[in-house]
């Protein structure tokens, strides 16, 4: 029995290129699925050479929660493994419901762990439940594709491995019994007030009576849907390139069929690690982009969809407070959730200023500046318009002030009287917004 599960389990590890440099962390609830996962990881560790730890998330929702944490601690101690116990408080006022809120808190704890891969005990029956749950919720292709056995990490978060995803729960229990393993039973798994439990105990048995192979069939359907979702991602990449990159040329974007435009914005949203917008919100955003010339800043899930001067892009809010700084020679200064970098350089791209002379602060009313010899002095509004900086970002632009005069404005440039001459050394300022890859791309060169 051990060999039967070790073979497919090892295939998933090989597919993820797991080796001696890999740091794996097993998500250990104490249930049979996670206990079997930990056992197989322990058996396969000498073959693959990976570093193995475990984590238990203590929700505090059950009177047995402390006992479960102690069980997991004993299990890991017997195997010489380090166990991290993460205690979380599950909010009850989020509107998500207890089941979803607990899952969200658990996920937030797990993805913050210092490892390369999180390893879960999800199995084929879990996959079937997930497909049905998301079908009834009205998910799209990516959601209906459910879980993948190998899910590479994104946004500096660890990847996810599910080596038992093609194994049914019955096979996992049989393995555990044959191997003499012990596990705990979570009484909440029998509570059909929770949607997934209702699917497991009430819906799937009825379907299985008519279609005995429902679990592997739904797993196969999920794999096909993931392939379709991957193809839509490829199409989004092609459409983004045709539109000129992450900051889209508005005229080219407007020429896309509505379904492809929506697909592109969904893909960009996912790439930024944000919550997917609702179908209705996405449709309304596309309608306004088509009908209004801009400037526009429209809510889109966790992000904002912006349109200005013939460009369309997604950005996050930077709500961090702006604090004035006296520059005393530091290589960088914080600015909101971003920063201003200051490096040594020369020529017209450098600023003639000494440490202790410049104050980093927001724009002030009546700000005017001349960008180069022979050029007129322009108002702050005119400078922003010429640089393509939209109205909602202007109050948060960083300005270096010297003796009450604006010497440099982030995204715009250096005032003529503070520019270094050819061969003269000075300081080169560069503004890096909160999310330079998304929020700041429409500003062009940050080092202006």
Swiss-Prot record:
Name of the featured protein: tRNA(Ile)-lysidine synthase
EC class: ligase
InterPro entries xref list: Lysidine-tRNA-synth_C, Rossmann-like_a/b/a_fold, TilS/TtcA_N, tRNA_Ile_lys_synt, tRNA_Ile_lys_synt_N, tRNA_Ile_lys_synt_subst-bd
Gene Ontology annotations for the cellular component aspect, listed alphabetically: cytoplasm
NCBIfam families: lysidine_TilS_C, lysidine_TilS_N
Coiled coil: none
EC number: 6.3.4.19
Reactions catalysed, as given in the entry: cytidine(34) in tRNA(Ile2) + L-lysine + ATP = lysidine(34) in tRNA(Ile2) + AMP + diphosphate + H(+)
Alphabetized PANTHER family for the sequence: TRNA(ILE)-LYSIDINE SYNTHASE-RELATED
Cross-referenced Pfam families: ATP_bind_3, TilS, TilS_C
Role played: Ligates lysine onto the cytidine present at position 34 of the AUA codon-specific tRNA(Ile) that contains the anticodon CAU, in an ATP-dependent manner. Cytidine is converted to lysidine, thus changing the amino acid specificity of the tRNA from methionine to isoleucine.
Record's subcellular location: Cytoplasm
A molecular function GO annotation: tRNA(Ile)-lysidine synthase activity
Binding positions (ATP): 29-34
Domain observations: The N-terminal region contains the highly conserved SGGXDS motif, predicted to be a P-loop motif involved in ATP binding.
Alphabetized UniProt keyword annotations: ATP-binding, Cytoplasm, Ligase, Nucleotide-binding, tRNA processing
Family statement drawn from the similarity comment of this UniProt entry: Belongs to the tRNA(Ile)-lysidine synthase family.
CDD domains hit by this protein: TilS_N
GO biological process, one term: tRNA modification
